[in-house]
Amino acid sequence: MAAESLRIATRRSQLAMWQAEHIAAELQRLHPGLEVELVPMSTRGDEILDQPLARIGGKGLFMKELEDGMLRGEADLAVHSMKDIPWRLPEGFDLAAVSDRADPRDAFVSNHYSDLDELPHGARVGTASLRRQCQIMDRRPDLQIEVLRGNVQTRLRKLDDGVYDAIILAASGLDRLELTHRIAGRLTPEQSLPAVGQGALGIECREGDERVMKLVEGLNHEATRIRINAERGMNARLEGSCQVPIGGYAELDGDEVHLRGLVGAIDGSEVIRGEIRGPAAEAENLGRQLGDDLLARGADRILKAVAEQQ
């Protein structure tokens, strides 16, 4: 009998390949003898680097080509950073599993400064994230925020070339690429509330593909899934994506989930924050409740203004 096999669609960047290889190794650990093939693909989001993501369609651009590959039968599943997965998946796809979460924090990376507060007046900070921009501007309105796109190595090279005084990246990505030594400091959630799902990996497959779902179910990390259900519940209520400055971070304390969320103006002139606690079994509903609270306190007005700016 032929050995069982799986094909994993992945972006071509070094970080994306690491993530796919990590999931492949975990699958082979769970299923000895399983043959796993990586199917690298180029995405529009990787190719268009001279414009902000929000202007060219958001982070769904990192997924569409991988999803098309699954529909064509070229791959059985795709591995994504959870923060890149929209709150609503396209019809015909399921989120089959969510991996154990790595460090969800943002990393402050600089060759000359150890902390955001140490940056001099007018310093140039590179980031591709409206969420990060909003929170930095709220804390340090004197800084110059500039768009920074490209893979991790490209962003670090621009920092080293002196284009920026500091850049902000996901700590988990630097850790995974063994670049922890480049991190000058890890921003607390109070300094920079993480993106919804940041630090976890999501496994997407075709809806109703029971074979694949059964093979990957052992990768699902229940505690992480509960936390991310809360965060994505809030995001769903806000109809959020990378096109708007939204942060969401949930923590588990026994059977209780504690969710913090924020919505802010791009320039940091207004940031609405909220939090909620409740039973972990109701995580997604709690997220929706927090989303409603943020909307009632003005998030709807901010989100409308952000949409008009794009």
From Swiss-Prot:
Catalytic activity of the protein: 4 porphobilinogen + H2O = hydroxymethylbilane + 4 NH4(+)
UniProt xrefs under InterPro entries: HemC, Porphobilin_deaminase_cofac_BS, Porphobilin_deaminase_N, Porphobilinogen_deaminase_C, Porphobilinogen_deaminase_C_sf
Residues carrying S-(dipyrrolylmethanemethyl)cysteine: 242
S-S bonds: none
N-terminal signal peptide: none
Pfam families: Porphobil_deam, Porphobil_deamC
GO cellular component: cytoplasm
Entry note: cofactor: Binds 1 dipyrromethane group covalently.
EC code(s) of this entry: 2.5.1.61
Entry cofactors: dipyrromethane
HAMAP family reported in the protein's UniProt record: Porphobil_deam
Subunit structure: Monomer.
PANTHER family according to UniProt: PORPHOBILINOGEN DEAMINASE
Other information: The porphobilinogen subunits are added to the dipyrromethane group.
Record function comment: Tetrapolymerization of the monopyrrole PBG into the hydroxymethylbilane pre-uroporphyrinogen in several discrete steps.
Identification of the protein by name: Porphobilinogen deaminase
Gene name of this polypeptide: hemC
